[in-house]
């Protein structure tokens, strides 16, 4: 994981946003974005990994504007925008669109791999397991 002032800021926002959230396996949700952040190799993708679910899960408290005001650069904000799936758009169309942003693509690959890890959910496969595999295959090969 990359250590910087910006990453520290992202980490603090992530912990505050998800402090009471529990994942499907019964673990503190903060483990997920923190795990993704450890897979990243640069400052901006680390920030995106930490923040990737903050607006989607806590849009009542956080917005792209508030993250911009907090000092996150345009490339971080753009990647975060790509990572939010509008449910009116077919999932694979969303995946194909986000593949055009290299930061979003890198974070989504790590996110999909972690979501496909059945050890996170006490051995149960994710409900969208096949779709996630298809998305991962697409991103890794395009």
Language model: regions and residue ranges:
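Active-site helical microenvironments for divalent-metal-assisted chemistry
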Residues: 1-142
């Amino acid at each position: 994981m990359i250590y910087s002032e910006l990453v520290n800021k992202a980490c603090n926002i992530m912990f505050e946003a998800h402090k009471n959230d529990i994942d499907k396996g019964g673990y503190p949700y903060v483990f997920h974005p923190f795990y993704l952040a450890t897979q990243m190799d640069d400052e901006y993708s680390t920030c995106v990994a930490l923040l990737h679910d903050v607006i989607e899960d806590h849009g009542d408290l956080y917005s792209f504007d508030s993250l911009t005001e907090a000092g996150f650069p345009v490339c971080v904000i753009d990647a975060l925008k790509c990572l939010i799936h509008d449910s009116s758009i077919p999932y694979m169309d969303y995946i194909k669109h986000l593949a055009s942003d290299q930061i979003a693509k890198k974070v989504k690959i790590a996110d999909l791999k972690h979501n496909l890890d059945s050890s996170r959910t006490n051995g149960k496969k994710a409900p969208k397991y096949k779709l996630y595999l298809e998305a991962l295959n697409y991103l890794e090969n395009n």
